[in-house]
């Protein structure tokens, strides 16, 4: 039998294997209609409004910083009127989804791992089995669905706040009228960009929820191990967010199809 330190390693292969299997079980239970809707509404508040302030603050600041850097370069090229469009492309396609999902992973993913991990080490999960209650239906599926529903909304709100931050900086420091900024945004952004943004939000939400729950369910030991699981869940969720973002970019991005002449 493997030592406990190996079995409960924060980044052990056993945890990754369990989480991949858990994702399959989540799909199966979802297709069978097995979930606790009351629990979903409860977790919608925990993952949505509870995460809104840090998400909006991070996106506003990121929007202001990105606009400063972009406008500085475009002004030297005489293309300051295009700052809104360049900002919108980068922020909508990459920055808003990644920043928002990272904040949610830090706040919600760690909470899921800690909550379920604490239940695991205190044998509350075993008690659910005794009561013939499936933890996937009662604990995991509601959390994952709540993340899938709220992360896209938070990303859209973050995008709006980022644009507002960009408008403020462009107007205050570069004398670019807000209408010119917004017209540039409208000219560069396409409807497919918003669709991809929502698609990324669902993927990121599913990853955050599944990893947080998976790391919680594979926690053994005591309070120290619960903390380690929560920390590891945030790290793994962050990596998963970037991997999924790369996959979506490769699948749906406008990649060159041939070599230049």
Regions found by a protein language model. Give the residues of each.
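Short, membrane-interfacial amphipathic segments enriched in basic
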Residues: 2-38, 215-220
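Active-site cofactor/substrate anionic-group-binding motifs, chiefly glycine-
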Residues: 43-99, 103
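Selective transmembrane-helix segments that form parts of the transport pathway or gating/packing helices
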Residues: 48, 52, 56, 95, ...
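Hydrophobic alpha-helical transmembrane segments that constitute the membrane-spanning cores
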Residues: 58-61, 101, 141-170, 211, ...
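Membrane-interfacial helix-loop-helix connectors in multipass membrane proteins
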Residues: 69-92, 160-202, 210-232, 251-261
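A hydrophobic alpha-helix feature that marks transmembrane segments and, especially
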Residues: 102-120
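Short cytoplasmic-facing helical segments at TM-TM junctions of multi-pass membrane proteins
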Residues: 116-141, 223-226
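Final/C-terminal transmembrane alpha-helix of multipass membrane proteins
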Residues: 226, 234-249
């Amino acid at each position: 039998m493997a030592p406990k330190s190996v079995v409960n390693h924060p980044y052990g292969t056993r945890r990754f294997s369990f989480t991949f299997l858990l994702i399959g079980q989540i799909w199966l239970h979802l297709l069978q209609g097995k979930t606790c809707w009351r629990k979903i509404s409860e977790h919608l508040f925990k993952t949505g409004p509870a995460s809104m302030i840090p998400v909006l603050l991070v996106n506003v600041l990121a929007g202001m910083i990105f606009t400063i850097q972009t406008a500085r370069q475009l002004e030297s090229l005489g293309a300051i009127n295009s700052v809104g469009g360049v900002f919108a492309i980068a922020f909508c396609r990459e920055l808003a989804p990644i920043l928002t999902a990272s904040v949610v992973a830090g706040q919600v993913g760690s909470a899921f791992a800690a909550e379920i991990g604490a239940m695991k080490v205190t044998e509350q999960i075993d008690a659910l089995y005794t009561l013939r209650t499936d933890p996937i239906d009662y604990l995991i599926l509601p959390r994952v669905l709540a993340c899938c529903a709220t992360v896209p909304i938070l990303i859209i709100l973050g995008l709006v706040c980022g644009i507002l931050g960009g408008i403020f900086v462009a107007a205050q420091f570069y004398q670019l009228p807000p209408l010119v900024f917004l017209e540039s945004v409208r000219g560069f952004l396409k409807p497919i960009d918003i669709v991809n943004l929502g698609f990324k939000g669902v993927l990121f939400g599913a990853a955050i929820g599944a990893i947080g729950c998976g790391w919680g369910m594979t926690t053994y030991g005591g309070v120290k191990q619960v903390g380690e699981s929560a920390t590891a869940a945030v790290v793994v969720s962050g990596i998963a967010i970037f991997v999924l973002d790369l996959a979506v970019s490769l699948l749906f991005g406008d990649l060159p199809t041939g070599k230049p002449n």
